[in-house]
Amino acid sequence: MDGGGVDTATTAAWMEKHRHMYERATRHPFTVSIRDGTVDMSAFKRWLSQDYLFVREFVAFIASVLLKCCKQEDSSDMEIILGGVASISDEISWFKNEATVWGVDLASVSPLKANLEYHRFLRSFTEPEISYAVAVTTFWTIETVYQDSFGFCIQDGNKTPPELLGTCQRWGSAGFRQYCQSLQSIVDRCLANAPADAVQSAEEAFVRVLELEIGFWDMSSSRS
């Protein structure tokens, strides 16, 4: 242990400590219904359109993480984070193509309440006083929730509708899981050298992302 008294298993410890909330975020009834083959397709279309808006906002967030990374003495994380930036253009194109397939008019979509709340949270990371450790923790948590959620939809025994397998494989793939693990390693390393107040702020960000993800899934299932 060093820095804020944190060892290299900090993220794993958080996932255990906040297990109930983590499972609510990654085994939400919405994504479980995809795996079970019982998903309401109108809910899926709502998720598709709202997540498209989220991803557009996510671009600025990743840029803020990258900027904080560049200011670190050791900027070796940059290549991994740049991988996230590079994938965004493809992701936006994917959403547009899927919207066409599903007959969703993205131009007419407005962000719902839970989405706007998430947007406000992401925008707060442009503030210079928010540390790189907190920012990269947030980035890792967002990506990991999606990987775990959609990865579950393609595990053995799934009844995921064939037309949704591409969506689930996009975030549930082994390649994306490896990317999330790379981010997790960065987070653990940063936290091992961070002061106690930064570690606490990072844990609070971890929990906040879980809350926002649950709200986003809830929004997809309803119209709130």
Swiss-Prot record:
GO molecular function terms attached to this record: thiaminase activity
The protein's role, per its UniProt record: Involved in thiamine salvage by hydrolyzing the thiamine breakdown product 4-amino-5-aminomethyl-2-methylpyrimidine (amino-HMP) to 4-amino-5-hydroxymethyl-2-methylpyrimidine (HMP). Has a high formylamino-HMP amidohydrolase activity. No activity with other thiamine degradation products such as thiamine mono- or diphosphate, oxothiamine, oxythiamine, thiamine disulfide, desthiothiamine or thiochrome as substrates. Does not display thiaminase II activity, as it is unable to hydrolyze thiamine.
UniProt source species: Zea mays (Maize)
Swiss-Prot/TrEMBL catalytic activity: 4-amino-5-aminomethyl-2-methylpyrimidine + H2O = 4-amino-5-hydroxymethyl-2-methylpyrimidine + NH4(+); thiamine + H2O = 5-(2-hydroxyethyl)-4-methylthiazole + 4-amino-5-hydroxymethyl-2-methylpyrimidine + H(+)
Broad class of enzyme this protein falls into: hydrolase
Enzyme nomenclature, EC number: 3.5.1.-, 3.5.99.2
Known tissue expression: Expressed in roots and shoots.
CDD domains documented for this protein: TenA_E_At3g16990-like
Associated pathway: Cofactor biosynthesis; thiamine diphosphate biosynthesis
Protein name: Bifunctional TENA2 protein
An annotated GO BP: thiamine diphosphate biosynthetic process
Key words, A-Z: Disulfide bond, Hydrolase, Thiamine biosynthesis
Residues that bind substrate: D51, E91, E143
InterPro entries reported for this sequence: Haem_Oase-like_multi-hlx, TenA_E, Thiaminase-2/PQQC, Thiamine_Salvage_TenA
Domain of life: Eukaryota
Catalytic residues, chain numbering: E213 (proton donor)
Similarity remark: Belongs to the thiaminase-2 family.
Any one GO cellular component localisation term in the record: cytosol
Encoding gene (name): TENA2
A Pfam match: TENA_THI-4
Disulfide partners: C153-C168
Gene3D superfamilies linked: Heme oxygenase-like
